[in-house]
């Protein structure tokens, strides 16, 4: 076996520690972001940038969109998960993954919210994006967040 873990990654020249710290900064790294363009017909209406979400963010969003029910075994037991509001979950996922500067400019625009009659950024997403557009954005967020990514090489003997 010739593969030995060293203190330096030969591909990047980074030390192991530098590599770990670089990997940990994925949410704030513009190289990990992607621009989403919203167009109708031939006209580009607006664009915004999305970033990867970490697993805790995804779990928190799911919890916020889940209705919890009393445990049938009694009040002394933890509540159980009921129905997940998938429409709200998808909107909140887009909202959370939008880069903060773009979120403030687009989804949290007080004037746009007032004119569309909504109170929150997640509601703006429901008003502005069509179902298929939301689906496409969610796919990109999941891809940026590493879902479906191949993160290791398989060793063959």
Regions found by a protein language model. Give the residues of each.
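Short, surface-exposed, charged amphipathic helix/loop patches that serve as local interaction elements
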Residues: 2-7, 40-157
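Extended hydrophobic/Leu-rich segments
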Residues: 17, 21, 36-38, 112
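Short acidic-hydrophobic surface loop/beta-edge motif
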Residues: 31-43
């Amino acid at each position: 076996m010739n593969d030995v873990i060293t203190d330096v990654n030969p591909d990047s020249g980074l030390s192991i520690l530098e590599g770990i710290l670089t990997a940990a900064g994925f949410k704030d790294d513009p190289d990990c972001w992607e621009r989403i363009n919203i167009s109708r017909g031939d006209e580009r209406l607006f664009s915004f940038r999305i970033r990867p979400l970490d697993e805790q963010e995804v779990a928190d969003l799911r919890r916020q969109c889940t209705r919890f029910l009393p445990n049938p075994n009694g009040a002394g037991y933890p509540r159980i998960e009921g129905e997940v509001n998938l429409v709200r979950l998808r909107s909140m996922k887009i909202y959370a993954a939008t880069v903060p500067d773009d979120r403030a400019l687009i989804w949290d625009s007080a004037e746009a919210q007032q004119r569309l009659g909504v109170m929150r950024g997640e509601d703006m997403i429901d008003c502005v994006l069509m179902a298929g557009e939301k689906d496409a954005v969610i796919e990109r967020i999941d891809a940026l967040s590493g879902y479906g990514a191949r993160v290791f090489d398989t060793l063959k003997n």
